[in-house]
Amino acid sequence: MKQILFMDTTLRDGEQSPGVNLNEQEKLQIARQLERLGINVMEAGFAAASEGDFQSVKRIANTIQNATVMSLARAKESDIRRAYEAVKGAVSPRLHVFLATSDIHMKYKLCMSKEDVLDSIHRSVTLGKSLFPTVQFSAEDATRTSRAFLAEAVEVAIRAGANVINIPDTVGYTNPEEYYSLFKYLQESVPSYEKAIFSCHCHDDLGMAVANSLAAVEGGALQVEGTINGIGERAGNAALEEVAVALHIRKDFYEAESSMTLKEIKATSTLVSRLTGMVVPKNKAIVGANAFAHESGIHQDGVLKEVTTYEIIEPSLIGESQNLFVLGKHSGRHAFTEKMKELGYEFTKEERDVVFEAFKNLADRKKEITEEDLRALMLGEAAFAAQQYSITQLQVHFVSNSTQCATVVLKDEEGNMYEDAATGSGSIEAIYNAIQRILGLECDLADYRIQSITQGQDALAHVHVELKEGTHQVSGFGVAQDVLEASARAYVHAAGKLKSFITLVK
């Protein structure tokens, strides 16, 4: 049984999804959950892209203990050295250097000859190997590259010291049979093939990213790259949770396994969805809301008689809870702390006191507190704690068929209070206008979405907003039992990010 490594690029490729804008604290939250999931390698970002990216990569590298942390870099000395400075503090640092090898990229993007590309690969990998214990080389647009030249480029990279060779389907162009044969071709055509681990990286432009990844495993790939929920540029990447469960359920066919902690899949998917604002489709495989639902009477009858008639995956395998009541208003601090530890959360005493107070406030208003509620509570409190501004008071004057008025009081990190009021055609517009007046912002609301965390009239609300000012767009979220409060929290979260960006560029 061969062991498959999983390389997660949610924090780099996934964050390139249109409208996704994660701050440092949010990236760290995801990185910690990826560690709990058992991801072998996480691409923390592109350190040379900006100072913000550099700091995020560095913080993740200095925090994660049980996974390799990697930074992307172009085949440029400045990028490689910047990546080294960012991840050198990691327990297991890695460089990911890439260069395009297809004719179309070499001609129109790079303006380089094949000889120039081979020389650049050699120089960049050699430099990387002098700094990093492991180096991964990616031949960008590999599936549209001449196979003979691809084999030549891969051989140069391995001889220069590359430990991992990635064969990406950058534009989602290939199909399973073709991708399988490409890995087999490289196995036969690259003299130093056995000296490196071969990896696959598939995009979903033609809807075959997961199928192509599994075909690569059949063809000899020992590392699979992708993102949680399959997020990413254009149509996204291979969904790692789908690949992992497919390998587990069909061990008989693939004869492969991974070290992924499958019961953490649902929690990871939910966290990524809520922080990025990218909703998981209900019919998505593995983690969609309908993944274990049966509407057909024939199917329901079969499942009631014998669950395996129509269910090949047990919900508990991926950590899908039945949303049972776990805590209530009579639960004490110790029970709360132990339950949160069970869910993977650790606190300082000060953090525990703040979160426990938020829990008790929720328990006073909500009869039953589920695991989903606790995760949402943690997510909301973590976001709130990292904000420049917090809401201390929110008052809305509602009159049917009339202009609405809202009064908002915000507190900044130094404890200064700011109050203003505004009107709007609806309660939410009035709240948002008041917040804009306080923060001195002029921006457009590009998106507003609301989602119920659990069922019932007393369920928590999760609101996602996207704000746009010029060409810059940011997202924010808020969690509360009251929809207006959740909406206000989401707006303050996003507005704080936007205000920081505007201050930075000025």
From Swiss-Prot:
Localization in the cell: Cytoplasm
Example of a GO biological process term: L-leucine biosynthetic process
Catalysis: reaction(s): 3-methyl-2-oxobutanoate + acetyl-CoA + H2O = (2S)-2-isopropylmalate + CoA + H(+)
Keywords, comma-separated and alphabetical: Amino-acid biosynthesis, Branched-chain amino acid biosynthesis, Cytoplasm, Leucine biosynthesis, Manganese, Metal-binding, Transferase
Pathway: Amino-acid biosynthesis; L-leucine biosynthesis; L-leucine from 3-methyl-2-oxobutanoate: step 1/4
Requisite cofactors: Mn(2+)
GO cellular component: cytoplasm
Entries under PROSITE patterns matching the protein: AIPM_HOMOCIT_SYNTH_1, AIPM_HOMOCIT_SYNTH_2, PYR_CT
Region (Regulatory domain): 390-506
Broad class of where this protein is predominantly found: cytoplasm
Class of the enzyme per the UniProt entry, highest EC level: transferase
E.C. numbers: 2.3.3.13
InterPro entries noted in UniProt: 2-IPM_HCS-like, 2-isopropylmalate_synth_dimer, AIPM/Hcit_synth_CS, Aldolase_TIM, LeuA/HCS_post-cat, LeuA_allosteric_dom_sf, LeuA_bact_synth, PYR_CT
MF GO annotations: 2-isopropylmalate synthase activity; acetyl-CoA C-acetyltransferase activity; manganese ion binding
Quaternary structure, from the entry: Homodimer.
Entries under NCBIfam families matching the protein: leuA_bact, PRK00915.1-3, PRK00915.1-5
The family this protein is said to belong to: Belongs to the alpha-IPM synthase/homocitrate synthase family. LeuA type 1 subfamily.
Role this protein plays: Catalyzes the condensation of the acetyl group of acetyl-CoA with 3-methyl-2-oxobutanoate (2-ketoisovalerate) to form 3-carboxy-3-hydroxy-4-methylpentanoate (2-isopropylmalate).
Stated name of the protein: 2-isopropylmalate synthase
Species: Bacillus mycoides (strain KBAB4) (Bacillus weihenstephanensis)
